[in-house]
A protein has these predicted regions:
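Right-hand nucleic-acid polymerase module
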Residues: 1-93, 103-202
Length: 202
């Protein structure tokens, strides 16, 4: 590791420091873990073709997510990270977020309803889409750092022993990895972090 960090969001060492910094910032929440959920939001209707990642308007997408969260009625802080995984079966990048969200039942229900609108649910023909996943916060360190893991991956589908569709994640191939790292470097740590109800760290 270099004596002086380069500060790039495409650098594994610098991203690790970013994750540790976020973990330290959120440490006060350890005492109220039951008041939070770890939520994944998948925006199927915002899929990108392979070459579109370089011109993806992440600021416009962030504003969309921010407005959706605000309309849901959350009152406490929300923080997490953006990711784009490449799905081999449809040859598309899939924007999604892993978020630490307050356990506010009414707001979570409203958000789930918004995420399950037809436009998002029916974006992939013949595939059952699950746009929102909510989990209890049980392992603080592991789940919080997962929200800022910063490793975009390739997702490959496969049938299980009863023929049900499953997926497995793999390292991106060289060309896609290069595109992903260039985008992460462009976005920076601030651009890769979603916040609502909390001051953004520059």
């Amino acid at each position: 590791m270099l004596d002086k960090p380069c500060g790039s969001a495409a650098c594994p060492q610098c991203f690790r420091l970013h994750r540790l910094r976020k973990l330290a910032e959120l440490a006060p929440l350890r005492g109220c873990m039951s008041a939070y959920r770890v939520v994944t939001l998948v925006y199927y209707d915002a899929m990108l073709e392979e070459e579109q990642i370089s011109c993806w308007d992440h600021k416009k997408f962030r504003e969309r997510v921010y407005k959706m969260v605000k309309r849901a009625g959350f009152t406490d802080k929300i923080v997490g990270g953006y990711e784009l995984d490449f799905h081999t079966d449809i040859q598309r990048w899939m924007p999604h977020l892993h978020l630490l969200m307050p356990r506010e039942p009414g707001a979570l229900k409203t958000l789930r309803k918004a995420m399950k609108r037809d436009k998002n649910i029916r974006a992939r023909a013949g595939i059952i889409s699950r746009p929102m996943k909510s989990q209890k916060l049980r392992d603080f360190d592991a789940q919080v750092t997962y929200c800022f893991k910063g490793m975009w991956q390739e997702v490959r589908p496969y049938p299980d022993e009863v023929g049900k569709r499953r997926t497995r994640k793999h390292r991106l191939p060289p060309v896609l990895l290069a595109r992903a790292l260039c985008k992460q470097d462009e976005m920076g740590f601030t651009g890769l972090t979603f916040t609502s109800g909390v001051r953004t760290r520059k």
